[in-house]
Amino acid sequence: MIDGGMVDSPEKAARTAEVLKSEDIEILFIFISTYALSSTILPIAQRIKIPVILLNIQPVAAINYDYINGLGDRGKMTGEWLAHCQACSTPEFACVFNRAGIKYDILTGYLEEPYVWNEIENWIDAVRAVQGMRNNRMGILGHYYCGMLDVYTDITRQSFTFGTHIELLEMCELKAYRDAVTEDERTAKRLEFSMKFEVDPHCEEYELD
């Protein structure tokens, strides 16, 4: 995770964009901590060209108007209002992104709301899945059943959409690969399977080997 810090000017936005680009980040969460001008985030979204999530997240579920009105000081009252002003900027950001052709999503809620954190985790999981697909090497064994058109796959699209490298295998090739595996390699791969996948207990040992 890379923290771009507080961005409050177009100049700092440009510098932050370069830092984020150099870190090769996969997704950008923009936390709207108070009212902000769209000019402070447009340079970032323009330059890094990755999914953008606007976090329209309030500090609490509802503003305590009695507390704010009881402060008796316009400066303090304005400060408290600005601390709850996330939703004021969100339409401005969305308008500019729409006009600029920048794709984005908006997550709305408040900090202690479980839904908000679940959604953030879902976005992170999605990025992990995309990253895994991009570094994936997938083997295809056999051929399609003639006439079963609904299962035919465009492997070229699979490659350029997700970055997956695809190996087309014949059974004789697969057997040769299997015969070349050492006992230590087999044991290590079985351990990796058990750590990364939920293996059905009904699977026979010889099938896993």
Where are these regions (language model features)?
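An N-terminal assembly and electron-transfer interface module characteristic of large anaerobic redox
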Residues: 1-209
